[in-house]
A protein has these predicted regions:
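N-terminal small/polar-rich segments of proteins
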Residues: 26-96, 128-168
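Extended, solvent-exposed segments with strong compositional bias
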Residues: 104-133
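Predominantly extracellular/luminal cell-surface or secreted proteins
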Residues: 72-76, 98-102, 112-116
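Bacterial N-terminal signal peptides that target proteins for export
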Residues: 2-14
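Residues that form or immediately flank small-molecule/cofactor binding pockets and catalytic motifs
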Residues: 44, 102-104
């Protein structure tokens, strides 16, 4: 008999909303959002899926702003080497997984999205905001993967990962 595991949303990322600038005449606001990442049913073979991370920034008035940012992800319940989803009902069980930044499925294990520690990477970039121009949008691909291995107890598994955005 096959065991089917239905992982829930892997990454429930807390979105950060920041208002920064050098004063009331030089300000901008940004919204960070993540699409849902659902890996489907796990039956022992590696599975992966992807979602989009989107950063939208709007100029608040005044002159021009040069914006540099970093988006870092927490390890969730596990650690960066191997994140872990917990079963949401009894009996307790876990399911290993990880999150990757802009990686292709064949090279997932080389781009773990974290906070820059322990060999992990974070999403970074820069752009200019000009007074009166349209908002600036930047996107990154968030990959999630469950490695091949024994299937745990059937059920819903989830983890909560916190996203932190830094403006430099």
């Amino acid at each position: 008999m096959k065991s089917y595991v239905r992982p829930g949303v892997v990454a429930r990322c807390a979105a950060a909303l920041a208002l920064l600038g050098s004063g009331p005449a030089m300000a901008f606001s940004c919204n960070l959002s993540f699409g849902s990442l659902n890996l489907g049913a796990f039956v022992g073979t590696q599975i992966s899926s992807f979602s989009q991370a989107t950063l939208v920034c709007t100029h608040g008035g005044g002159g021009n702003e040069s914006v540099s940012f970093q988006v870092r992800l927490s390890p969730g319940v596990g650690n960066y080497a191997q994140r872990q989803m917990n079963r949401t009902s009894a009996p307790a069980d876990t399911l290993p997984y990880n999150l990757y930044l802009n990686a292709l499925p064949a090279v997932l294990n080389t781009f773990v999205w974290g906070d820059g520690s322990g060999g992990t990477l974070f999403w970074s970039g820069n752009f200019n905001l000009n007074n009166g121009n349209s908002p600036v949008t930047r996107t990154a691909t968030l990959w999630g993967a469950i490695p091949a291995g024994p299937a745990p107890s059937a059920g819903v598994y989830q983890d909560t990962v916190v996203a932190t955005i830094l403006f430099l």
